[in-house]
């Protein structure tokens, strides 16, 4: 009998975009997470289950072995790298860009640049690479407000269409990284359940 295989996924866009890949691997969820309160979803294989978690928590579940594989955004992985997991595949889904954005008509400032962002580690690494010292302000959402009320000079955030930036008088200025969702694996699980996991990887790869 095959070992139990647990796949960590988050609700919303990533789950929706991952469904065709799961189907290509003949893994069919038995319930719709958007309509169910269950956080552990059975599939058409009794030894394969889905763990529905927050997008930012998926790497943690995989790194600690609570899930064998999972899907996580590159933005999340850049913020919290772990020695216990590996990226297996760029799934080419949930694509966007991590960018610096600022007011269309930037005001002169005589202080060290203030950057509002949810992505503290990525922003810190980016500005360190440029040799520029900045003050980073941690926010969890509605980043676009910060420059409008002088909380920050610029923001570092994910940009998809750019419509939200435009609506708030901001423009993208600097590209930090291309973001997409990645298939990640727990290092120990990859050794002990290699065939099961590799079969899924190859089917995902063929469907991308």
Swiss-Prot record:
One of its GO terms (molecular function) is ATP binding. Lacks the C-terminal regulatory region which is replaced by HisZ. This is ATP phosphoribosyltransferase. InterPro entries: ATP_PRibTrfase_cat, ATP_PRibTrfase_CS, ATP_PRibTrfase_HisG, ATP_PRibTrfase_HisG_short. Heteromultimer composed of HisG and HisZ subunits. One of its GO terms (cellular component) is cytoplasm. It is found in: Cytoplasm. It comes from Hydrogenovibrio crunogenus (strain DSM 25203 / XCL-2) (Thiomicrospira crunogena). Catalyzes the condensation of ATP and 5-phosphoribose 1-diphosphate to form N'-(5'-phosphoribosyl)-ATP (PR-ATP). Has a crucial role in the pathway because the rate of histidine biosynthesis seems to be controlled primarily by regulation of HisG enzymatic activity.
């Amino acid at each position: 009998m095959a070992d139990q295989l647990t796949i960590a996924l988050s609700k919303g866009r990533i789950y929706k975009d991952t469904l065709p890949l799961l189907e290509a691997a003949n893994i069919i969820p038995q319930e719709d997470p958007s309509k169910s309160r269950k956080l552990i979803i059975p599939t058409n294989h009794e030894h394969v289950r889905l763990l529905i978690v927050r997008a930012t928590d998926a790497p943690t579940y995989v790194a600690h072995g609570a899930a064998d594989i999972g899907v996580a955004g590159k933005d999340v992985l850049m913020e919290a790298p772990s020695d216990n997991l590996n990226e297996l595949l760029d799934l080419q889904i949930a694509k966007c860009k991590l960018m610096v954005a600022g007011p269309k008509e930037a005001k002169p400032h005589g202080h060290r640049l203030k950057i509002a962002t949810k992505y503290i580690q990525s922003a810190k690494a980016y500005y360190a690479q440029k040799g520029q010292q900045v003050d980073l302000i941690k926010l969890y959402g509605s980043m676009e407000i910060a420059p409008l009320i002088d909380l920050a000079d610029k923001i570092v955030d994910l940009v998809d269409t750019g419509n939200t930036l435009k609506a708030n008088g901001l423009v993208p200025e600097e590209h930090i990284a291309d973001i997409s969702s990645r298939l990640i694996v727990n290092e120990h699980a990859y050794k002990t359940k290699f065939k099961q996991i590799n079969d899924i990887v190859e089917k995902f790869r063929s469907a991308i």
